């Protein structure tokens, strides 16, 4: 035990980095286990869309949406979700909802808000449209 104490005292910065990483890892595990949504892959997204009538909700800007989006995706801004304006999603609360952004990071809050608003099956495309493109999945360009 004294050897550990001596090591930590001699390598204080290294020890603090390890403690910080451990705390961050624990926080990440707790956050993902308590999230109101689940993260899914591009393949799981296509299965939800094709087999369970899943709806893709793209929360990127209008310009980004026009440059390329998943087929049949619904474009809703995060500000609309925060305000409770769900548009065409309002009558699809029991259908699978897949929230998509560019990287999968900014969609987390929107996914949580949708789940809290009563949407029963909310998912998040893990790593966003970057993962979708890396899986060689198609994007539709233009207004839709």
PLM features: residue spans?
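Short, solvent-exposed loop/turn elements at beta->coil junctions and helix N-caps
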Residues: 45
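Rhodanese-like catalytic fold shared by cysteine-dependent sulfurtransferases
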Residues: 1-39, 48, 54, 62-96, ...
């Amino acid at each position: 035990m004294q050897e550990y104490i001596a090591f930590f005292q001699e390598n204080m910065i290294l020890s603090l980095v390890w403690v910080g990483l451990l705390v961050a890892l624990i926080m990440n595990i707790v956050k993902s286990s308590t999230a109101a949504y689940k993260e899914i892959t591009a393949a799981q997204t296509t299965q939800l869309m094709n087999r369970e009538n899943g709806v893709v909700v793209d929360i990127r800007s209008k310009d980004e949406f026009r440059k390329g989006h998943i087929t049949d995706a619904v474009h809703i801004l995060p500000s609309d979700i925060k305000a409770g304006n769900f548009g065409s999603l309002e009558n699809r609360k029991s259908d699978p909802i897949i929230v998509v952004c560019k990287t999968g990071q900014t969609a987390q809050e929107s996914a949580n808000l949708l789940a809290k608003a009563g949407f029963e099956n909310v998912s998040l495309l893990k790593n966003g449209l970057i993962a979708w493109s890396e899986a060689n999945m198609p994007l539709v360009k233009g207004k839709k």
